[in-house]
């Protein structure tokens, strides 16, 4: 065989193998995209079912009630402690009075 024929045959085989590899990469990419779409849908469905479940609604109610109680407690403490300091700036001694 002539060297040109061998060179052309080698180039054609390299080109064919590159095309086959490219096709495999494309199919792998498509498979991964499909898998990720399916995983995303599954995760969204699971999150929706958890959010809609009765236990989640009850837990949200407990958290809301807890924050309300905390606000009420803080308001009570603040009211009780406000008697310990005078908010009137005129009642504070000045430096001239202290000396």
From Swiss-Prot:
UniProt region (Lipid-binding), positions on chain: 68-99
Post-translational modification: The most abundant glycoforms are characterized by an O-linked disaccharide galactose linked to N-acetylgalactosamine (Gal-GalNAc), further modified with up to 3 sialic acid residues. Less abundant glycoforms are characterized by more complex and fucosylated glycan moieties. O-glycosylated on Thr-94 with a core 1 or possibly core 8 glycan.
Record site: May interact with the LDL receptor: 41
One annotated Gene Ontology cellular component of this protein: very-low-density lipoprotein particle
Gene Ontology biological process: cholesterol homeostasis; lipid catabolic process; lipid transport; lipoprotein metabolic process; negative regulation of high-density lipoprotein particle clearance; negative regulation of low-density lipoprotein particle clearance; negative regulation of triglyceride catabolic process; negative regulation of very-low-density lipoprotein particle clearance
Main location: secreted
Compartments reported by the entry: Secreted
Annotated family: Belongs to the apolipoprotein C3 family.
Name of the protein described by the UniProt record: Apolipoprotein C-III
Species classification: Eukaryota, Metazoa, Chordata, Craniata, Vertebrata
Annotated gene: APOC3
